[in-house]
Structures are given as structure tokens and as C-alpha cells.
Amino acid sequence: MKKILFPVMFLAVIMASSCGKDDDPTTPPPTQNVDMTKATIERTSNNSEFKEAPETLPKQITTNTVLKTGKTYLLTDFTFVLNGATIKIEPGVTIKGSKSPNKGALIITRNGKIDAQGTAAAPIVFTSNQATPNSGDWGGLILLGNAPNNGAKDGVAGLQAVEGGVNETATGYGLHGGTKADDNSGILKYVRIEYPGIAFAVNDEINGVTFGSVGSGTTVDYVQVSYSGDDSFEWFGGTVNCKHLISYRATDDDFDTDNGFSGKIQFGLVLRDAAIADFGPSGASNGFESDNDADGTTKTPQTSAIFSNMTIVGPYANATAATTAAPYKRGAHIRRNSKISIFNSVFVGWPVGLFLDGALTEASATSNALEYKNNTIAGCPLVVAPGTATFNSQTWFSTAAFANQTLAAIADVKLTNTGYTTFDPTPATGSPLLAGADFSSAKLGGGAFTTTTYVGAAAAGDTWFKGWTKFVNK
């Protein structure tokens, strides 16, 4: 097909309507004009289709900026949103992250904000700029806020530097943490993030979406991370609540919670690929992984996130144990003094369903600070990992009042389809997930959770995971 290139000269003026995270200042940051004078339009001679070359985003965004519907943008490096500025991303925008020479990433600093409101018909897409994309092609999306965490930096309690090589000593752009539980980092809605996730160093990575001390004033709803080279979602402290999260064919963990994260998460989907796992020296691919901190201390705030209505489909759903990558471990690994709670959820096809790891975590389970109730574990050779000499984890899991159930085979749970490209996690006729949810725990009160009768992320006939999502092979 013959292509004719027409250089053009034009200017895209980007307007914005929001400012920093706190009260609107008297004088809002000026609108940023993004230079489009060197853009090129490509015309294909057979259909007169015009394609605008991607616009490269600057390394620093210091004024309110709008990314316009129908356009494509490029992250060639770390791009920081600073100085109370807001980056507004309109529905249908595509943002591509570079693979080399630098990995692109978008970082919303704790003095910046994002307003990314796609729609079911026109989601916002972050993806790789490679013709043949792969896991870990680019960095990812990082949101930093001023909510509490249990870390410390340079002797300052509650201050942390985000992982992934983002923090710069001279600027502190990667710092997060404070005392504002209701801090607002903006909005993520109907957003796909494809092929992100890089290991900057051992235990120092950028995930699909990284939340650093993000507050409960932030809105996160309908977000899919696909083919992350590390975790899909990781929270370091913070209080943000999230709904309708999807982790698709991740490398490391799907939902990783650390450093005092205490948010509430409902309606989460996971589908794992038996061949894609964390093959690093200490790699362990889990559905949930949760620590209070790296050393398992008693620092506060303690990691205490609450999850409900999660469907966590592991590698055995599409493979046998013999053909599943060795790093695959547990549907949920709760360790290092974490006390997260999980309700009304289903774990399918993992080597181990649940592992409560360590005496402090077991103590939280005994005291009901950590709750695991109305959950189903299906097709896991080891349902619950053994506890210590003073804690029988299987007996605890099987407590009648907890209403947990075990199913021997993956087929017994009767999900509609667990195929990689035909994924439909709704419960089919006769599924035990159609009923059995319970929202009587005080942890599920307060209005953050939607009461359901079904267990798992989707009701029979549900479609919330369709239309704006993408379930494809690489």
C-alpha cells in the first residue's frame, strides 16, 4: 500500500479545568501549550485515512494539560505531573510507553493530579509502543499522595520513596506520604494499562499501577492491567478505595498490599497464564501478596485492606500442574504481620489456596483482626498451607461460622469460561457462587461496599468486564 506523507504545521492548545489536590487556588496554574508544530499526518492512498503521529509528552508537566480525544501520545521517559497541575486525559486517548532507550512512565506526584475518565465505549489506553508488544515493555502508571503509611525516610516517619528508580534525590518527585487520609490524587475510570511493569532492581520495581499513599478522595473504578512485567496493582500505604479491577496474565502478583494500606476493594478479576510467571531468583507469583512491611514489624498503620467479591483464577484453569511455571505459589499469601481481610471471593486453580505466614499474622487471624469468610477455594491441591505448632490453619479456615467452602475440581465452581481469550467469569447455572455472600461483618459497612448475594466478582449475566476490556494473546 503506497503511503504519502504530508508535513503540517499546527498548534494544539490544551485547556484544563482542575488544579491541585487541595482547595482550588485563587489563581489556577496556566494552561500548558503542547508543541505540535512538528507533527506529521500520514495518508494512505487507498482509503484517504489520516493518521497523526504520536505527540511526545514532556518530562515535566507543570501546568494544567489536556490530552485530546482521538490523539495518540508517547512517553519516552519518566513524565512527572508537578506543582499542583492536573493532567486531563479525555475518552479514547491512547498513550504509548517507550521501551528504549528509556522506559516511559507517567508519575502523578503528590502535588499533582490525574483526571482520566474514559467510558465503556471509549476507554483510555496506556500501552506499549512496540510493534510486537510484550510484558514489561514500558514502566507504568504511578500515583503518589499524602495519605498515611508506616514507612520512614531520612528519619521522617510516614515518608517514603516509591520503588522503580523514580525518586530523584534533588527533587523528591518520587516521595509520598503524609497525614491526609482523604487526599485526592484524581480519577481513573475505564482505563486499560497494557504491557507495563519493569524491575529497576531486585525488589525495586514499577508495577502496572503503583499507588503510593493515595488517599480516599481518589476515584479508581474500571481499570484493567494486562501483561504486567511485575505486579498488576500494588499499594504502598494509603486509604484509596477501588472497584472493578482486572489483572490479566500478570508476571508477579495481582494484588500486592504493603506499608499500612487500608483501602477497600470490591469486584476484582484475575486470570493467570501458566507460562507467564516471576522467574527471578526469589520469584513467587501469587494472586494476593500482603505485608505490613518488608520486615514484618508492628509499625502502624498496619496493613489492613479489605477485599470483597474477588474472582482469582490461577494457572491450573488452563494448564496442568506439570505444565505450570514453577514460580506459581498461592492464591493468597498473607504474611509479615499483615491483617488484610477477604470476603465473598473465589480462588480457583492455584497450587495453594491460602497461606497465613508467620506468628503475628496468625495472631491477627485468631483475634479476628484478619478475617477470611464466605470464600470458596476450588481446584487447589493444597487448600490451606499448614500453620505453626500453635495455630491450625485448616481448622481455622473450616470454622463453621466463617462459611468457607472447598471444591475439589475447578469445574465444580462452574465459571462460564476461563479461556485466555474467551474469559467470562460469571457463574453458570448450578454454580455454588450464585448465592452465599454475607455482608454482616462490620468491616463491610460504611457504604464503601455494594451488597451482593453472589460470591465472586460477577453475577450471572453480568457484563461489567466487557466492552472496555481486552482479553487477547500477545
Kindly give the residue locations of the regions a language model identified.
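Primarily the HKD phosphodiesterase
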Residues: I95-K96
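Sec-dependent N-terminal signal peptides
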Residues: I4-V13
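C-terminal motif of bacterial Sec signal peptides marking the signal peptidase cleavage site
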Residues: M15-S18
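Aromatic- and Lys/Arg-enriched surface recognition patch
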Residues: P123
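Positively charged n-region of N-terminal signal peptides that target proteins for export
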Residues: M1-I4, G20-K21
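Low-complexity, highly charged intrinsically disordered N-terminal segments
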Residues: G20-D23, N33
